[in-house]
Protein backbone atom coordinates (compact mmCIF):
# COMPACT_ATOMS: atom_id res chain seq x y z
CA UNK A 1 0.00 0.00 0.00
CA UNK A 2 2.80 2.39 0.93
CA UNK A 3 4.48 1.65 -2.41
CA UNK A 4 1.31 2.58 -4.29
CA UNK A 5 0.94 5.90 -2.40
CA UNK A 6 4.56 6.87 -3.08
CA UNK A 7 4.17 6.04 -6.75
CA UNK A 8 0.99 8.12 -6.99
CA UNK A 9 2.70 11.03 -5.24
CA UNK A 10 5.67 10.89 -7.63
CA UNK A 11 3.35 10.80 -10.61
CA UNK A 12 1.47 13.81 -9.25
CA UNK A 13 4.68 15.78 -8.74
CA UNK A 14 5.93 14.96 -12.22
CA UNK A 15 2.59 15.99 -13.67
CA UNK A 16 2.80 19.28 -11.83
CA UNK A 17 6.26 19.95 -13.20
CA UNK A 18 5.08 19.21 -16.70
CA UNK A 19 2.17 21.59 -16.29
CA UNK A 20 4.39 24.49 -15.23
CA UNK A 21 7.15 24.03 -17.85
CA UNK A 22 6.60 26.68 -20.55
CA UNK A 23 6.41 25.48 -24.14
CA UNK A 24 9.50 26.15 -26.26
CA UNK A 25 9.59 29.58 -27.89
CA UNK A 26 8.84 29.78 -31.57
CA UNK A 27 11.85 30.45 -33.75
CA UNK A 28 12.01 34.07 -34.95
CA UNK A 29 10.76 34.85 -38.42
CA UNK A 30 13.18 36.96 -40.41
CA UNK A 31 11.78 39.99 -42.20
CA UNK A 32 12.60 40.27 -45.89
CA UNK A 33 14.57 43.53 -45.99
CA UNK A 34 14.72 43.56 -49.80
CA UNK A 35 11.19 42.82 -51.06
CA UNK A 36 11.75 44.81 -54.28
CA UNK A 37 15.19 43.59 -55.37
CA UNK A 38 17.20 44.94 -58.25
CA UNK A 39 16.67 43.07 -61.51
CA UNK A 40 19.31 45.13 -63.32
CA UNK A 41 21.61 43.30 -65.71
CA UNK A 42 24.29 45.16 -67.59
CA UNK A 43 23.98 45.70 -71.30
CA UNK A 44 26.56 43.95 -73.50
CA UNK A 45 29.84 45.75 -74.04
CA UNK A 46 33.16 45.26 -75.77
CA UNK A 47 36.77 45.32 -74.63
CA UNK A 48 37.68 48.95 -75.33
CA UNK A 49 40.74 51.18 -75.25
CA UNK A 50 40.51 54.99 -75.27
CA UNK A 51 43.92 56.34 -76.15
CA UNK A 52 45.39 59.85 -76.26
CA UNK A 53 42.73 61.61 -74.16
CA UNK A 54 43.20 63.75 -71.07
CA UNK A 55 41.97 61.64 -68.16
CA UNK A 56 40.42 62.78 -64.88
CA UNK A 57 40.43 59.64 -62.74
CA UNK A 58 38.00 60.98 -60.10
CA UNK A 59 40.63 60.63 -57.38
CA UNK A 60 42.22 64.03 -58.02
CA UNK A 61 44.64 62.87 -60.71
CA UNK A 62 44.96 64.22 -64.26
CA UNK A 63 46.74 62.16 -66.93
CA UNK A 64 47.64 63.92 -70.17
CA UNK A 65 47.84 61.71 -73.25
CA UNK A 66 46.28 59.01 -71.11
CA UNK A 67 44.93 55.55 -71.79
CA UNK A 68 41.85 53.87 -70.33
CA UNK A 69 41.14 50.18 -70.86
CA UNK A 70 37.85 48.58 -69.87
CA UNK A 71 35.95 45.37 -70.54
CA UNK A 72 33.73 42.77 -68.89
CA UNK A 73 31.93 45.64 -67.20
CA UNK A 74 34.93 46.97 -65.28
CA UNK A 75 37.93 49.24 -65.63
CA UNK A 76 40.99 47.15 -66.53
CA UNK A 77 43.76 49.76 -66.50
CA UNK A 78 44.34 53.53 -66.43
CA UNK A 79 47.67 55.10 -67.27
CA UNK A 80 49.79 56.93 -69.79
CA UNK A 81 50.50 56.25 -73.45
CA UNK A 82 52.76 53.31 -72.62
CA UNK A 83 49.84 51.03 -71.71
CA UNK A 84 49.57 48.26 -74.29
CA UNK A 85 46.23 47.46 -75.88
CA UNK A 86 44.83 43.96 -75.26
CA UNK A 87 44.34 41.76 -78.28
CA UNK A 88 40.98 42.25 -79.96
CA UNK A 89 40.15 45.50 -78.19
CA UNK A 90 38.17 48.28 -79.86
CA UNK A 91 40.45 51.33 -80.12
CA UNK A 92 39.07 54.86 -79.77
CA UNK A 93 41.19 57.89 -80.62
CA UNK A 94 40.78 60.30 -77.73
CA UNK A 95 43.17 62.96 -78.96
CA UNK A 96 41.89 66.41 -78.01
CA UNK A 97 39.17 64.86 -75.86
CA UNK A 98 38.69 64.12 -72.15
CA UNK A 99 37.71 61.00 -70.22
CA UNK A 100 36.11 61.13 -66.78
CA UNK A 101 34.14 58.89 -64.46
CA UNK A 102 30.41 59.12 -65.07
CA UNK A 103 28.76 61.90 -63.12
CA UNK A 104 26.74 60.84 -60.07
CA UNK A 105 23.86 63.05 -58.92
CA UNK A 106 22.98 62.36 -55.29
CA UNK A 107 19.89 64.58 -55.32
CA UNK A 108 17.43 64.06 -58.13
CA UNK A 109 13.67 63.84 -58.50
CA UNK A 110 13.64 62.37 -61.98
CA UNK A 111 10.89 59.80 -62.10
CA UNK A 112 8.98 60.98 -59.03
CA UNK A 113 8.61 64.52 -60.40
CA UNK A 114 8.94 63.59 -64.08
CA UNK A 115 8.37 65.40 -67.33
CA UNK A 116 5.80 66.42 -68.37
CA UNK A 117 5.35 68.27 -65.10
CA UNK A 118 1.64 67.67 -64.54
CA UNK A 119 -0.07 67.28 -61.18
CA UNK A 120 -1.03 63.72 -62.12
CA UNK A 121 2.67 62.82 -62.25
CA UNK A 122 3.66 64.74 -59.10
CA UNK A 123 4.53 61.88 -56.76
CA UNK A 124 7.49 63.04 -54.68
CA UNK A 125 5.86 64.27 -51.44
CA UNK A 126 3.45 62.19 -49.36
CA UNK A 127 2.27 65.36 -47.62
CA UNK A 128 -0.38 63.71 -45.46
CA UNK A 129 1.70 63.89 -42.29
CA UNK A 130 5.16 65.11 -41.27
CA UNK A 131 6.46 61.62 -40.40
CA UNK A 132 6.39 59.30 -43.41
CA UNK A 133 9.46 57.05 -43.36
CA UNK A 134 7.28 54.18 -44.60
CA UNK A 135 7.04 55.53 -48.16
CA UNK A 136 9.66 54.56 -50.74
CA UNK A 137 10.59 56.83 -53.63
CA UNK A 138 11.00 53.86 -55.97
CA UNK A 139 7.27 53.23 -55.77
CA UNK A 140 6.71 56.61 -57.42
CA UNK A 141 9.53 56.51 -59.98
CA UNK A 142 8.33 56.43 -63.58
CA UNK A 143 11.13 54.80 -65.59
CA UNK A 144 9.94 56.43 -68.81
CA UNK A 145 10.63 59.97 -67.61
CA UNK A 146 12.37 61.63 -70.59
CA UNK A 147 14.66 63.34 -68.09
CA UNK A 148 16.68 60.17 -67.62
CA UNK A 149 17.92 60.12 -71.20
CA UNK A 150 18.59 63.88 -71.16
CA UNK A 151 20.72 63.48 -68.03
CA UNK A 152 22.71 60.75 -69.78
CA UNK A 153 23.20 62.33 -73.19
CA UNK A 154 23.52 65.98 -72.22
CA UNK A 155 25.04 65.57 -68.77
CA UNK A 156 27.02 62.34 -68.70
CA UNK A 157 25.10 61.20 -65.60
CA UNK A 158 25.49 57.46 -65.13
CA UNK A 159 24.16 57.01 -61.57
CA UNK A 160 21.63 59.00 -59.57
CA UNK A 161 19.76 58.93 -56.29
CA UNK A 162 16.03 59.57 -56.47
CA UNK A 163 14.71 61.13 -53.27
CA UNK A 164 11.27 61.91 -51.88
CA UNK A 165 10.57 65.61 -51.52
CA UNK A 166 11.23 67.78 -48.47
CA UNK A 167 7.72 68.55 -47.22
CA UNK A 168 8.07 66.06 -44.38
CA UNK A 169 10.43 65.75 -41.43
CA UNK A 170 10.79 62.11 -42.47
CA UNK A 171 10.15 61.97 -46.19
CA UNK A 172 10.75 58.29 -46.90
CA UNK A 173 13.33 56.06 -48.52
CA UNK A 174 15.46 57.04 -51.49
CA UNK A 175 16.72 54.70 -54.20
CA UNK A 176 19.96 54.63 -56.22
CA UNK A 177 19.58 53.96 -59.94
CA UNK A 178 21.74 53.13 -62.91
CA UNK A 179 20.82 55.56 -65.67
CA UNK A 180 19.82 52.90 -68.17
CA UNK A 181 16.61 52.35 -70.13
CA UNK A 182 14.35 49.88 -68.33
CA UNK A 183 10.69 48.93 -68.20
CA UNK A 184 10.63 48.88 -64.40
CA UNK A 185 12.39 50.81 -61.68
CA UNK A 186 13.78 47.51 -60.41
CA UNK A 187 15.52 47.15 -63.75
CA UNK A 188 17.38 50.38 -62.96
CA UNK A 189 18.19 49.76 -59.28
CA UNK A 190 21.90 49.82 -58.53
CA UNK A 191 22.70 46.33 -57.18
CA UNK A 192 23.99 46.43 -53.62
CA UNK A 193 23.43 50.16 -53.09
CA UNK A 194 21.99 50.87 -49.63
CA UNK A 195 18.72 52.69 -49.23
CA UNK A 196 18.70 56.26 -48.02
CA UNK A 197 16.25 58.05 -45.74
CA UNK A 198 15.24 61.58 -46.65
CA UNK A 199 14.87 63.89 -43.66
CA UNK A 200 14.19 67.62 -43.64
CA UNK A 201 14.53 70.51 -41.24
CA UNK A 202 13.71 74.19 -41.48
CA UNK A 203 11.13 76.01 -43.53
CA UNK A 204 9.51 73.33 -45.67
CA UNK A 205 7.89 71.20 -42.93
CA UNK A 206 6.83 74.41 -41.13
CA UNK A 207 5.22 75.76 -44.28
CA UNK A 208 3.40 72.55 -45.15
CA UNK A 209 2.14 71.61 -41.67
CA UNK A 210 1.96 74.92 -39.80
CA UNK A 211 -1.78 75.18 -40.50
CA UNK A 212 -2.43 71.42 -40.44
CA UNK A 213 -1.82 70.68 -36.78
CA UNK A 214 1.90 71.32 -36.79
CA UNK A 215 4.73 71.46 -36.35
CA UNK A 216 4.75 75.17 -37.11
CA UNK A 217 8.10 76.20 -35.59
CA UNK A 218 11.67 74.99 -35.78
CA UNK A 219 11.49 73.83 -32.18
CA UNK A 220 8.35 71.91 -33.10
CA UNK A 221 10.23 70.26 -35.96
CA UNK A 222 12.92 69.07 -33.56
CA UNK A 223 10.44 67.89 -30.92
CA UNK A 224 8.50 65.76 -33.40
CA UNK A 225 11.70 64.35 -34.84
CA UNK A 226 13.09 63.42 -31.41
CA UNK A 227 9.82 61.79 -30.37
CA UNK A 228 9.90 59.72 -33.55
CA UNK A 229 13.43 58.49 -32.86
CA UNK A 230 12.34 57.51 -29.32
CA UNK A 231 9.64 55.31 -30.84
CA UNK A 232 12.17 53.87 -33.26
CA UNK A 233 14.57 52.96 -30.45
CA UNK A 234 11.82 51.12 -28.57
CA UNK A 235 10.75 49.32 -31.75
CA UNK A 236 14.34 48.28 -32.40
CA UNK A 237 14.71 46.92 -28.86
CA UNK A 238 11.61 44.75 -29.25
CA UNK A 239 12.67 43.38 -32.61
CA UNK A 240 16.29 42.84 -31.59
CA UNK A 241 15.10 40.80 -28.60
CA UNK A 242 12.65 38.82 -30.71
CA UNK A 243 15.25 38.00 -33.35
CA UNK A 244 17.65 36.85 -30.63
CA UNK A 245 15.31 34.82 -28.43
CA UNK A 246 12.20 34.09 -30.51
CA UNK A 247 8.73 33.99 -28.98
CA UNK A 248 5.77 36.12 -29.96
CA UNK A 249 6.55 38.29 -32.95
CA UNK A 250 6.13 42.04 -32.29
CA UNK A 251 3.76 43.95 -34.53
CA UNK A 252 5.20 45.19 -37.82
CA UNK A 253 5.38 48.92 -38.53
CA UNK A 254 6.68 49.89 -41.96
CA UNK A 255 7.70 53.35 -40.79
CA UNK A 256 9.65 51.95 -37.86
CA UNK A 257 11.23 49.28 -40.09
CA UNK A 258 12.90 52.09 -42.01
CA UNK A 259 14.08 53.89 -38.87
CA UNK A 260 15.35 50.65 -37.39
CA UNK A 261 17.36 50.20 -40.57
CA UNK A 262 18.95 53.60 -39.93
CA UNK A 263 19.76 52.73 -36.32
CA UNK A 264 21.31 49.45 -37.53
CA UNK A 265 23.51 51.37 -39.99
CA UNK A 266 21.88 49.80 -43.04
CA UNK A 267 20.07 52.90 -44.33
CA UNK A 268 21.87 56.20 -44.92
CA UNK A 269 20.51 59.57 -43.77
CA UNK A 270 20.24 62.28 -46.44
CA UNK A 271 19.15 65.42 -44.60
CA UNK A 272 17.66 68.45 -46.39
CA UNK A 273 19.03 71.38 -44.36
CA UNK A 274 20.16 74.91 -45.28
CA UNK A 275 21.25 76.76 -42.14
CA UNK A 276 24.46 76.08 -40.24
CA UNK A 277 22.79 76.20 -36.82
CA UNK A 278 20.17 73.66 -37.85
CA UNK A 279 22.78 71.31 -39.28
CA UNK A 280 24.60 71.49 -35.94
CA UNK A 281 21.38 70.62 -34.09
CA UNK A 282 20.78 67.65 -36.39
CA UNK A 283 24.32 66.42 -35.71
CA UNK A 284 23.67 66.60 -31.96
CA UNK A 285 20.40 64.74 -32.43
CA UNK A 286 22.12 61.98 -34.38
CA UNK A 287 24.47 61.48 -31.44
CA UNK A 288 21.58 61.50 -28.98
CA UNK A 289 19.86 58.62 -30.77
CA UNK A 290 22.84 56.75 -32.16
CA UNK A 291 22.76 57.16 -35.93
CA UNK A 292 25.02 58.83 -38.47
CA UNK A 293 24.11 61.55 -40.95
CA UNK A 294 25.66 60.71 -44.31
CA UNK A 295 24.99 64.05 -46.01
CA UNK A 296 23.32 67.41 -45.63
CA UNK A 297 21.60 68.42 -48.86
CA UNK A 298 21.51 71.99 -50.21
CA UNK A 299 23.59 73.09 -47.20
CA UNK A 300 24.02 76.68 -48.38
CA UNK A 301 25.64 77.61 -45.04
CA UNK A 302 27.96 74.59 -44.94
CA UNK A 303 30.95 76.92 -45.20
CA UNK A 304 30.18 78.16 -41.67
CA UNK A 305 30.58 74.70 -40.14
CA UNK A 306 32.93 73.01 -42.61
CA UNK A 307 35.22 71.92 -39.79
CA UNK A 308 32.28 70.33 -37.97
CA UNK A 309 31.28 68.43 -41.10
CA UNK A 310 34.83 67.17 -41.56
CA UNK A 311 35.10 66.08 -37.93
CA UNK A 312 31.85 64.11 -38.18
CA UNK A 313 32.49 62.60 -41.63
CA UNK A 314 29.41 64.24 -43.13
CA UNK A 315 29.18 65.23 -46.79
CA UNK A 316 27.73 68.57 -47.88
CA UNK A 317 25.67 68.37 -51.07
CA UNK A 318 25.54 71.84 -52.61
CA UNK A 319 24.74 74.07 -55.56
CA UNK A 320 27.34 76.33 -57.08
CA UNK A 321 25.31 79.53 -56.92
CA UNK A 322 21.60 78.81 -56.53
CA UNK A 323 20.38 80.68 -53.48
CA UNK A 324 18.21 83.53 -52.19
CA UNK A 325 14.89 81.96 -53.21
CA UNK A 326 13.75 81.74 -49.57
CA UNK A 327 15.02 83.09 -46.27
CA UNK A 328 16.93 79.98 -45.17
CA UNK A 329 18.80 80.02 -48.49
CA UNK A 330 19.74 83.70 -48.23
CA UNK A 331 23.15 83.70 -46.55
CA UNK A 332 24.98 81.70 -49.21
CA UNK A 333 28.29 82.41 -50.89
CA UNK A 334 29.66 81.23 -54.22
CA UNK A 335 32.76 79.82 -52.54
CA UNK A 336 30.71 77.37 -50.45
CA UNK A 337 31.79 74.19 -52.27
CA UNK A 338 35.54 74.93 -52.44
CA UNK A 339 35.59 76.12 -48.81
CA UNK A 340 34.00 72.89 -47.63
CA UNK A 341 36.53 70.96 -49.72
CA UNK A 342 39.40 73.01 -48.32
CA UNK A 343 38.35 72.13 -44.76
CA UNK A 344 38.84 68.45 -45.54
CA UNK A 345 35.13 67.69 -45.69
CA UNK A 346 33.30 65.80 -48.42
CA UNK A 347 32.00 68.35 -50.97
CA UNK A 348 29.44 67.36 -53.61
CA UNK A 349 27.75 69.19 -56.48
CA UNK A 350 24.08 68.27 -56.96
CA UNK A 351 21.18 69.28 -59.16
CA UNK A 352 17.73 68.89 -57.53
CA UNK A 353 16.52 69.92 -60.96
CA UNK A 354 15.76 68.27 -64.31
CA UNK A 355 17.78 70.92 -66.17
CA UNK A 356 20.71 71.31 -63.78
CA UNK A 357 21.31 67.57 -63.93
CA UNK A 358 22.19 68.03 -67.60
CA UNK A 359 24.93 70.55 -66.74
CA UNK A 360 26.52 69.44 -63.49
CA UNK A 361 29.95 69.68 -65.09
CA UNK A 362 29.28 73.39 -65.61
CA UNK A 363 28.11 73.76 -62.01
CA UNK A 364 31.40 72.27 -60.82
CA UNK A 365 33.26 74.60 -63.18
CA UNK A 366 31.58 77.64 -61.63
CA UNK A 367 32.39 76.50 -58.10
CA UNK A 368 35.99 75.80 -59.09
CA UNK A 369 36.39 79.23 -60.69
CA UNK A 370 34.91 80.95 -57.63
CA UNK A 371 37.29 79.07 -55.36
CA UNK A 372 40.34 79.93 -57.45
CA UNK A 373 39.33 83.61 -57.57
CA UNK A 374 39.05 83.58 -53.78
CA UNK A 375 42.58 82.22 -53.47
CA UNK A 376 41.60 78.87 -51.99
CA UNK A 377 44.66 76.62 -52.36
CA UNK A 378 44.96 73.18 -53.91
CA UNK A 379 42.15 73.48 -56.44
CA UNK A 380 42.27 72.10 -59.97
CA UNK A 381 39.95 70.58 -62.53
CA UNK A 382 41.08 67.08 -61.55
CA UNK A 383 40.36 67.81 -57.89
CA UNK A 384 36.98 69.35 -58.69
CA UNK A 385 35.92 66.17 -60.48
CA UNK A 386 35.85 64.50 -57.05
CA UNK A 387 32.78 66.67 -56.37
CA UNK A 388 31.00 65.00 -59.30
CA UNK A 389 31.86 61.32 -58.94
CA UNK A 390 34.05 60.11 -56.08
CA UNK A 391 32.38 62.04 -53.26
CA UNK A 392 28.85 61.32 -54.51
CA UNK A 393 29.73 57.61 -54.64
CA UNK A 394 30.93 57.85 -51.04
CA UNK A 395 27.67 59.49 -49.95
CA UNK A 396 25.65 56.73 -51.62
CA UNK A 397 27.69 53.91 -50.11
CA UNK A 398 28.92 52.68 -53.50
CA UNK A 399 32.48 54.02 -53.60
CA UNK A 400 33.81 50.47 -53.71
CA UNK A 401 31.88 49.96 -56.95
CA UNK A 402 32.03 53.21 -58.91
CA UNK A 403 32.94 56.92 -58.72
CA UNK A 404 36.52 56.73 -59.99
CA UNK A 405 38.52 55.11 -62.76
CA UNK A 406 40.31 52.43 -60.77
CA UNK A 407 40.96 48.89 -61.98
CA UNK A 408 38.18 46.59 -60.82
CA UNK A 409 35.55 49.29 -60.47
CA UNK A 410 32.51 49.41 -62.72
CA UNK A 411 33.30 50.99 -66.06
CA UNK A 412 31.03 54.05 -65.79
CA UNK A 413 32.74 56.71 -67.87
CA UNK A 414 32.26 59.58 -70.28
CA UNK A 415 34.24 60.63 -73.33
CA UNK A 416 33.86 64.42 -73.67
CA UNK A 417 34.45 66.22 -76.96
CA UNK A 418 36.52 68.83 -75.10
CA UNK A 419 37.36 70.00 -71.60
CA UNK A 420 34.23 69.21 -69.54
CA UNK A 421 34.81 72.37 -67.50
CA UNK A 422 34.08 74.39 -70.64
CA UNK A 423 30.54 75.50 -71.47
CA UNK A 424 31.19 74.40 -75.04
CA UNK A 425 31.94 70.75 -74.26
CA UNK A 426 29.44 67.95 -74.06
CA UNK A 427 29.42 64.15 -73.81
CA UNK A 428 30.40 62.41 -77.01
CA UNK A 429 30.05 58.85 -75.73
CA UNK A 430 28.88 57.37 -72.41
CA UNK A 431 29.41 53.89 -70.98
CA UNK A 432 27.69 52.25 -68.00
CA UNK A 433 29.24 49.02 -66.74
CA UNK A 434 31.34 49.04 -69.90
CA UNK A 435 28.29 49.08 -72.18
CA UNK A 436 28.01 52.01 -74.55
CA UNK A 437 24.71 53.69 -73.74
CA UNK A 438 25.19 56.82 -75.85
CA UNK A 439 27.13 57.76 -78.97
CA UNK A 440 26.54 61.24 -80.36
CA UNK A 441 27.53 60.02 -83.83
CA UNK A 442 25.10 57.10 -83.86
CA UNK A 443 21.35 57.87 -83.76
CA UNK A 444 20.71 54.27 -82.74
CA UNK A 445 22.61 54.88 -79.51
CA UNK A 446 20.45 57.69 -78.16
CA UNK A 447 18.08 56.15 -75.63
CA UNK A 448 14.44 57.16 -76.03
CA UNK A 449 11.70 56.06 -73.65
CA UNK A 450 8.60 54.39 -75.02
CA UNK A 451 6.58 57.38 -73.81
CA UNK A 452 8.45 59.65 -76.22
CA UNK A 453 8.18 57.49 -79.32
CA UNK A 454 6.31 59.29 -82.07
CA UNK A 455 6.04 62.56 -80.16
CA UNK A 456 7.49 65.94 -81.15
CA UNK A 457 10.98 66.32 -79.78
CA UNK A 458 11.50 62.57 -79.58
CA UNK A 459 14.97 61.89 -78.24
CA UNK A 460 16.11 65.48 -78.76
CA UNK A 461 19.57 66.40 -77.52
CA UNK A 462 19.78 70.00 -76.42
What are these regions (language model features)?
Residues 39, 44, 115-116, 122-135, ...:
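His/Asp/Glu-enriched, well-ordered alpha-helical/loop segment
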Amino acid sequence: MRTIVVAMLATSLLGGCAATTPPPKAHPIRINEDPYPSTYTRYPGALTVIRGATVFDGEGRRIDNGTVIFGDGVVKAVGDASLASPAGAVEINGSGKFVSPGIIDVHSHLGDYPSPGTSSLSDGNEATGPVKPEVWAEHSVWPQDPGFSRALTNGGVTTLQILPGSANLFGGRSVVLKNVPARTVQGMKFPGAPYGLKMACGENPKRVYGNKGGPQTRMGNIAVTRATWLRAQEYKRKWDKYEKTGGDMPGRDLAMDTLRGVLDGKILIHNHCYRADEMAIMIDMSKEFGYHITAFHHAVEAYKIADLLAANNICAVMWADWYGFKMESYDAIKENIPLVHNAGACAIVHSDDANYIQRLNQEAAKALADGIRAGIPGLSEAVAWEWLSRNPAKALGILDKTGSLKPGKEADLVLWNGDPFSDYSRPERVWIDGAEMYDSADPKKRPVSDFELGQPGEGDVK
